[in-house]
Amino acid sequence: MSAIFGEQLPKSSRVEYIGDVPIIEECPRDVKTLDGEPILLFGKWSYEDVVVRDPGLRRYICLKPVILPHTEGRYQNTRFGKARIPIVERLINLMMRPGRNTGKKHKAYNIVKRAFDLIYYKTGKNPLQVFIDAIINTAPREEITRIIMGGIAYSVSVDVSPQRRLDLALRWITEGARACSFNNPKPIEECLADEIIAAAANDPKSYAVRKREELERIAAASR
């Protein structure tokens, strides 16, 4: 069993292991309705042609077809449960910040739904694919950590795990949308759409792209 901070954590029955190493399987993509029709996100957007071009993130971006991205917290006490939550739901959950938005999931759901409509109107592309491309472009590959040797603290560069890469990308995308909408007449759904479009194009105007470049630059200087 894995030990974190000296504690033995039980293995999850939902996760397969090779020894002590967990195996994260990709979410199923062939889910259909009882009539054999494909399931569309928000009743509009197809999952079938969406491609995750980063092999390292492929197992952690859940693209299981769902109409309503809401799992009711069933994975909250499961190790690596975040990898089984639909990626759009994770975006919705992160839009429920800061504290005054806590619990307002229907509000966050409508923001993301309208943002995806705006992405389609502005790009003509499947907004789900644009969102996945934005995640890949903003997920950092290096960061820094502090180690203490001989009573002196050093910052050293380390590789970022796939799960943390995904966490940081989603966090920065939502932070960028909130920062854009603060004291701005532009609605937050338009800010979120613009942030995702800019990140998908790897545009430096994107808050998330700038944060990734800043972190990787600091990590490169600490090698």
UniProtKB/Swiss-Prot annotation:
User: What is the documented function of this protein?
Assistant: One of the primary rRNA binding proteins, it binds directly to 16S rRNA where it nucleates assembly of the head domain of the 30S subunit. Is located at the subunit interface close to the decoding center.
Entry protein name: Small ribosomal subunit protein uS7
Q: Which species is this record about?
A: Pyrobaculum aerophilum (strain ATCC 51768 / DSM 7523 / JCM 9630 / CIP 104966 / NBRC 100827 / IM2)
GO cellular component: a single term: cytosolic small ribosomal subunit
Reply yes or no: does the keyword Plastid apply. no
Q: Which SUPFAM superfamilies does the UniProt entry name for this protein?
A: Ribosomal protein S7
What family is reported?
Belongs to the universal ribosomal protein uS7 family.
- What HAMAP family does UniProt report for this protein, alphabetically? Ribosomal_uS7_A
Q: Which InterPro entries match?
A: Ribosomal_uS7, Ribosomal_uS7_arc, Ribosomal_uS7_CS, Ribosomal_uS7_dom, Ribosomal_uS7_dom_sf, Ribosomal_uS7_euk/arc
Alphabetically list the UniProt keywords. Ribonucleoprotein, Ribosomal protein, RNA-binding, rRNA-binding
Q: Name one GO molecular function term.
A: mRNA binding
Q: How does it assemble?
A: Part of the 30S ribosomal subunit.
Upper taxonomic lineage: Archaea, Thermoproteota, Thermoprotei, Thermoproteales, Thermoproteaceae
User: Is Transcription included in the keywords of this UniProt record?
Assistant: no
> What is a biological process (GO) this protein takes part in?
ribosomal small subunit assembly
